[in-house]
Amino acid sequence: MKTNFLVFITFTILISLGFWQLSRLKEKKLFLASMQANLTSPAINLAEIQDGLPYHKVKITGQFLPNKDIYLYGRRSMSSEKDGYYLVTPFKTIEDKVILVARGWFSNRNKNIITQATNDRQHEIIGVTMPSEKTRIYLPANDIKNNVWLTLNLKETSKVLGLDLENFYIIAEGKDISNLDILLPLAINHLAAIRNDHLEYALTWFGLAISLIVIYVIYRRRYMAVDVIPRACSGIQKNN
């Protein structure tokens, strides 16, 4: 009886997890479709965003703040030099908002030249809003002293730069306003190419549930066979 109960509970949990993953599959499909629509639509002003900030194409006008650049480490497979940094600079809009903007990527050997990229002239930036990154325990801490960042956590960035930053940053589209050849433009079209593995997860849970039932049926049949043989032998002995 105890075994039956444990099997039933485990089977119910596995099936529930499978249906939960199917629900997540539907939610993620809608999310990716919405993101793709946002990325392919014309850029809008920040004030026009109604359904949350992340993954919208926006345009902002203002100026970069000098001497506030951040070097966010990242590998770039399309470059002959794999190791380098994303240039991230605070941008003060005409609405008096301060937003971090990821402007482009440069190789490690150009780190000393990239300081020429920032000026205080007014510019219009078009890009995609992104949420703050979370600090991950398996990554080293940001090297603030040498300005080498591994995680763009906006709360930490605000504290280090001494700025009241918005709770999102922007990946700029196209070539940077500096026109420096060493600063490679960032692509935004790939942002919606996120894997949706929830169907595989659902099939895994359903498969485990089916496997559990198969194993249980085999176990019950063998248990019943072992139980029947001694009783049959006992009956033969009594007849003798």
Curated annotation (Swiss-Prot):
Source superkingdom: Bacteria
Gene Ontology annotations for the cellular component aspect, listed alphabetically: plasma membrane
Primary residence: membrane
Locations listed in the record: Cell membrane
Topology of the protein relative to the lipid bilayer: Multi-pass membrane protein
One Pfam family recorded for the sequence: SURF1
TM spans (from-to): 7-23, 201-219
Coiled coil spans: none
Keywords, sorted A to Z: Cell membrane, Membrane, Transmembrane, Transmembrane helix
Homology family: Belongs to the SURF1 family.
Protein name in the entry: SURF1-like protein
Organism: Rickettsia conorii (strain ATCC VR-613 / Malish 7)
